[in-house]
Structures are given as structure tokens and as C-alpha cells.
Amino acid sequence: MNNSNRIRLTWISYLSYALTGALVIVTGIVMGNIAEYFNLPIASMSNTFTFLNAGILISIFLNAWLMEIIPLKRQLVFGFILMLIAIAGLMVGHNLMIFSISMFIFGVVSGITMSIGTFLVTHMYEGRQRGSRLLFTDSFFSMAGMIFPIAAAMLLARHIEWYWVYACIGLLYVGIFVLTLCSEFPVLGHKATDQSKPVVKEKWGVGVLFLAIAALCYILGQLGFIQWVPEYATKTFNMNISQAGQLVSNFWISYMIGMWIFSFILRFFDLQRIVTVLAAMATLAMYLFVSTDNPAYLSYYILALGFVSSAIYTTLITLGSLQTKVSSPKLVNFILTCGTVGTMLTFVVTGPIVANNGVHAALATANGLYLAVFILCLALGFFTKHRSHGHVTH
């Protein structure tokens, strides 16, 4: 693979994560306007966005097998057509069913592109460089999550219809589409096998199970924590909504900075050891946030939490990809799917806890999930195969 083609494929990976970040995080900005557009209460409207998450989950799960059947280039070109259909549906369709279908299509396209983007990085880069590249790729999720809500707010403030926000997000896929047409993609499945060599299926090992459960616990813990921080800050410490929102902003800004810094640092450390240390530090930072009685300390603790936890999820995925000698799209997508299940379970798990025991109990549960991630990462040290496969150098 020549260098210019590798760069194009890497940028497809970057934009795939930016697309998912924009679609998921912009929801909170446009939800009120969409509810008003359909003349529905905002609580009812929020349920329809489940179609977006469902589309992401289903497509990531299925694409573990589809990648070996349908060429990656064809999938991305087809995704562009689906993206146009979904945006057109939002613009010309004026009923809730078409909106829900469009959201599901967005989710499917997002899941397909993100799973392809993740595989491309794990396929093109080896060892610790894979971890740093994947982490930098993941930072585009957060970057889009910061840029597009601001852009959406500007459009809505100028009384431009909400569906133009999704048209703007669609521009990211235009970039993916153009790069796709100019690029050559790795061939997977039976076509990729060397006929002179027998195909040997590698066993994943128990380490993959540990990583998958850790990914689920991490995402469930992170979202279960950050979704309830504003409520906790306003109810427990009598902060106004602006101050509570600033805590959340501090978390994501610190998270993004952490991603950039760790993308350079990770290549110098053994991934299993560094993720164990980071999980321990994140658990401690969250414990300090949840247990403090002084609101002045909350910003410091959440900044620390965002920074040290920024590399955990991507490192879990990277370690998963290193459990086999040849990177497996099924393995990577399995861990991604488990993480996405954590997203889907956020309110299913934390909602009843808040209703019965209060917001503090939900945050304590999130802290317990982070502790579980630490224990799983520690135990992984006895089962991981990344060292025996020679994946500990650049």
C-alpha cells in the first residue's frame, strides 16, 4: 500500500468518527426544535432518537460479517446514497414515521462507516502505533461533538429549519465519499487469502471476553456518570444550569486534550499496563467527585477524570485487535458492539436507580462500573496475547 493511499484511508477513518460524533451529540441541541416541529412533548420526542442508536448497534454488529462479503468501497458508496435518502426524508417528510426511519438510516450509515474506519486503522498500523493512531482517530468524535452543536445553535438562532443541521453533518460524508472514490481498500474474506497457504482461524482467547465486558462497563459508566452530572450539581450543590453545564464542558474539553496527548504517549508503554493504571486513576477521580462535599473541587475532579479516562476505551479496542496475529474485523466489531450496548443501556440502568435512590446513587453505580473496568484490566494481564504476538514495539 503506497503512502498517499494510506493517508486517504486514514482520513476516511477520521471522518467516520466525526460523523458518528456529530450525529449522536447534536441530538440534545435540536431535540426541542424537532419536538416543536412535530408538536410533541420533548420526552416523547427523545424516544424516537433510540432509532439512531439502534441503527448504529445493528450495523456495527452485522458489519463484522458483511465486511468479508461486501467490499468496503462498495459499502461506503452505498452509505452515501443512504445518507442522501435520509436527509431528503427529513426535508420532505413531515411525519414521525419518516423521521424515525431517517434516524435509523443515519444510525446504519454511521455504524457501517465507523466500523470500517476502526478496521482500517487496526489493519494499516501495528503494535503501539495502532493504539496511538486509533486514539487520535477517536478524538475526531469529540471534536465533531464540540463543533457541530455550536454550528447547530448558530443555525437555529437564525431561525433556519433544524433539518439543515443534518444536511451540514452530511457534508462529512461527502468528504468520505470523495476520498473513497480515490482510494484502494484492503480486500477481506476468501478473496484476500493466499491460496498457497492454508487458512488458519485464530482463537480469540478469554482476554477478548475481558476486554468486551470492560468496554461495556466503561461506556455505561462514563455515560451514566456524565448524563446525570448536571442534575447532581443543581440538586445537591444548588448550582445554576450554566454552572452545571460548564462541568460537562470541562469534562469533554479535558477528554479531547487527553486524547491528543495520549496519542503520542501510548506508543512508549505496554498497553495492558497503561490502561490498568488509567482505569485506577479514573476510578479514583470519579470517587473524589462523587464523595466531595465542596462544590469548589468539582471542576478539578472532573477535569482530572476527563483527562485520565480519555485513552481507556480506545486502548481496550486496540488491545482487542492485538489478541490475534492478524487483525480481525469480527473481533474489533465485537468489542465495538459491546461498547454500543453500554450506550443503549445508559438510561435503562440509571433511570430506575435515580427514581428509587436518587442521582447520587447513579453516580456511585458509575463509579462501581469504573472499578470493574480496573479489575478486568488488571486480570487481563494474566490472559492477554498481545505480548506473545510481538505487538509491544512500534
From Swiss-Prot:
Name of the protein this chain belongs to: Protein TsgA homolog
Main location: membrane
NCBIfam families membership: PRK03699.1
Keywords for this protein: Cell inner membrane, Cell membrane, Membrane, Transmembrane, Transmembrane helix
TM helices/strands, residue ranges: 11-31, 51-71, 76-96, 101-121, 134-154, 162-182, 206-226, 246-266, 274-294, 302-322, 334-354, 363-383
Molecular function terms, GO-annotated: transmembrane transporter activity
Organismal lineage: Bacteria, Pseudomonadati, Pseudomonadota, Gammaproteobacteria, Enterobacterales
Family: Belongs to the major facilitator superfamily. TsgA family.
Cross-referenced Gene3D superfamilies: MFS general substrate transporter like domains (1.20.1250.20)
Compartments (UniProt record): Cell inner membrane
Gene that specifies this protein: tsgA
One Pfam family linked to the record: MFS_1
UniProt superkingdom: Bacteria
Entries under SUPFAM superfamilies matching the protein: MFS general substrate transporter (SSF103473)
Membrane topology value: Multi-pass membrane protein
GO cellular component: plasma membrane
